[in-house]
Regions:
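Conserved SF2 helicase motif VI
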Residues: 241-263, 280
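C-terminal accessory region of SF2 helicases/translocases
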Residues: 259-307
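SF2 helicase motor core recognition
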Residues: 171-174, 215-231, 249-257
Length: 307
């Protein structure tokens, strides 16, 4: 997968002067694949599958037209790419699904055939990994679920919120956590595709129902939501805008919170995500010193006003 992305990125550079829009779109598509590879085996498998299917459709159209004419590949404007951090998570999800599926550096039918064949091989490898159950990132979360902090003074499990990004990872984690805890009713999932009313009901259940222990969500579902009954949070994926890590934690560490809140961030070392996260920690430490250790108390007040 890394080699595929590297090769495509090298080819992308050729579009620097010829077609800046295509360069941006293909570069964005490859960045999405890298992020989904880091997210979960399910996310990268489904992304590769969708990309392969979309490019196969383009290949069929190109063969019929014999000149590659047909449906234009999806694009995202330069302005959208520059201001991606300002978009809501459900809008970003839509961009990702459209762009990652179809943007390609292929300029001829032969090049498109080669890329489709490469994707078939990568898709098969991703499926093998998914079926193998070998997922280091999930193993880290599995260990967190065993920590003493997961239990309250009364011996019952405390409520946990898990933030991720791709919907494929949301469902993947739901299945994993249900199997781990042994009770389907103890896990709920919310995302941008869930209606606002249904989200409200799920959050209300999470706040009131002792049997609902784990809420898995993405930022689209979490915006404006008060999750103060949860005291434990895991960032399974970093958001596009790393500053949203602070916002996520502010959903449980609100003004009036009497429990100590704990946050785990699952980030691989020696990656772009890891570098961004390290810089964010430096910013948070500077803010903590400036605010006398009340950085998340202040964030909690801000989100109390927005909710």
């Amino acid at each position: 997968m890394t080699e595929y992305v590297r090769n495509e990125m090298n080819r992308v550079q050729r579009f620097a002067d010829q077609d800046g829009r295509k360069r941006n779109n293909v570069g964005f598509a490859l960045q999405i694949l890298q992020r989904r590879l880091a997210s979960s085996p399910a996310a990268i498998y489904q992304s590769l599958k969708r990309r392969r299917e979309r490019l196969e459709d383009e290949l069929s159209e190109a063969r019929i037209a014999r000149r590659g004419e047909g449906t234009l590949p999806p694009t995202i404007s330069d302005e959208m790419l520059r201001n991606l951090d300002e978009y809501a998570q459900d809008e970003i999800d839509e961009f990702e699904d459209v762009i990652s599926a179809g943007a390609t550096t292929a300029e001829t039918i032969e090049q498109l055939e080669i890329e489709v064949q490469t994707l078939r091989g990568l898709e098969a490898m991703a499926l093998d990994v998914l079926h193998s159950g070998k997922d280091t990132k999930w193993q880290q979360l599995d260990r967190i679920l065993d920590e003493d902090l997961m239990l309250g003074a009364d011996g019952y499990r405390r409520k946990l919120i898990i933030f991720t990004e791709p919907k494929d990872t949301l469902e993947y984690l739901r299945q994993k956590v249900v199997a781990r805890l042994g009770r389907p009713e103890c896990v709920e999932v919310i995302h941008g595709g869930v209606s606002r009313e249904e989200r409200r009901k799920v959050v209300e259940r999470f706040m009131q129902d002792r049997d609902l222990l784990v809420l898995i969500a993405n930022d689209a579902a979490g915006e404006g939501v008060n999750l103060q009954r949860g005291h434990l949070m895991v960032n399974y994926d970093l958001p596009w805008n790393p500053n949203k890590i602070e916002q996520r934690f502010g959903r449980i560490h609100r003004i009036g919170q009497t429990e100590v809140c704990h946050l785990w961030n699952l980030v691989a070392k020696d990656t772009r995500e890891g570098e961004v996260y390290a810089r964010l920690l430096e910013k948070l430490e500077a803010a903590r010193e400036a605010l006398g250790g009340r950085v998340y108390d202040v964030l909690g007040e801000l989100f109390q006003e927005r909710a």
